Curated annotation (Swiss-Prot):
Record annotation: effect of changing residue 83 to A: Prevents oxidation of the protein
Name of the molecule in the record: Glutathione peroxidase-like peroxiredoxin 2
Enzyme class, broadest EC rank: oxidoreductase
Catalysed reactions listed for this entry: a hydroperoxide + [thioredoxin]-dithiol = an alcohol + [thioredoxin]-disulfide + H2O
Amino acid sequence: MTTSFYDLECKDKKGESFKFDQLKGKVVLIVNVASKCGFTPQYKELEELYKKYQDKGFVILGFPCNQFGKQEPGSDEQITEFCQLNYGVTFPIMKKIDVNGSNADSVYNYLKSQKAGLLGFKGIKWNFEKFLVDSNGKVVQRFSSLTKPSSLDQEIQSLLSK
């Protein structure tokens, strides 16, 4: 079991290793995403947050997942193209993963172990659940799919000013 956020590693959309130790000192928002979901328009607000704060040490990592209503059926290339064409996404989109179950990615196993959801439920309930990590690698908040990215603005500002 991973003991530190910075020990985590995943694959980027090209299948290359992405080590979380490069995120030290940054505020990070991690979101499981999907292209064919009612919450898909959240990409727009996520991109706005990223553009607003990326120069101040803020990063968003999007993790495509097809576990909820099969709403992310595309290949990694198709997902990237969709995000760029429809929402102008410039924040990193990682390789498609599972977030729940026996094949769940280690990133999500770690996040869920650090911050349970509503009523202590650890599993991810739907697309566009969000985890906010401070600049010391502590998972400080978990937000449901219903939480609009724009509503996280003050929280992100506060973490960036610490």
